[in-house]
């Protein structure tokens, strides 16, 4: 379990999550996520932090992130896998989520168990609380479809965990990694064919392709 210094945990968070992860197969690398309330000190609760719950790699890669590490708990088998990583990484929660979607197993409990403090100093930035808000797509036009930092982390992940990945996982990751080399039309075909999604939406990625730079 990771903890961030500026969040406020409910009294039952640790006990609830510990009991939940104990019910999973200890031999299978597993991670369990709960939700959180987004909390602004000057406003109060503005919504929930986690708006999508990806369980496969196709729905994770274009998020350019993972669910907050402070909302997770993982077993010893997952810990051993994470320790195989060598060198810098985009974010620890990104690695954890990649492993859960490929090598291990992910569990979700859509239950808020903490206040996720939203302010300008958050490492992951200010959290939007409406995934269907058109502003989340059209705002910050300079932001790319794919964050280079996370792209590089996926590339490194593919190499480090090659022996643990099934062939179908390798194929999907390789398709994602090759996208910067393809034309706009080829990108569209690849995204649709492989069912890449962002917030459970293929079309969301396609819209971004026309509005934003692909990677930087």
Task: For the regions a language model picked out, list residue spans one by one.
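Nucleotide-sugar donor-binding/catalytic module of glycosyltransferases
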Residues: 1-129, 206-215
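C-terminal subregions of glycosyltransferases and related glycan-biosynthesis enzymes
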Residues: 89, 117-216
């Amino acid at each position: 379990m990771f903890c961030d210094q500026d969040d406020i945990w409910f009294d039952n968070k640790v006990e609830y999550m510990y009991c939940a992860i104990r019910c999973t197969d200890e031999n299978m690398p597993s991670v369990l996520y709960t939700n959180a309330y987004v909390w602004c000190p000057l406003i109060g609760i503005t919504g929930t932090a986690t708006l999508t719950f990806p369980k496969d790699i196709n729905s994770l890669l274009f998020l350019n992130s993972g669910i907050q590490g402070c909302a997770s708990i993982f077993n010893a088998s997952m810990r051993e896998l994470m320790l195989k990583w060598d060198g810098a990484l985009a974010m620890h929660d990104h690695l954890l989520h990649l492993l859960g979607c490929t090598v291990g197993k992910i569990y979700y409990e859509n239950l808020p168990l903490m206040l996720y403090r939203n302010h300008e100093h958050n490492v992951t930035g200010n959290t939007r609380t409406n995934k269907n808000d058109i502003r989340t797509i059209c705002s910050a036009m300079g932001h790319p479809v794919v964050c280079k930092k996370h792209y590089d982390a996926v590339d490194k992940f593919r190499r480090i965990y090659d022996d643990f990945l099934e062939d179908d996982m390798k194929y999907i990751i390789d398709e994602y990694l090759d996208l910067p080399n393809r034309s706009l039309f080829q990108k569209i075909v690849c995204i649709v064919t492989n069912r890449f999604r962002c917030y459970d939406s293929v079309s969301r990625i396609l819209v971004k392709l026309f509005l934003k730079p692909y990677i930087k």
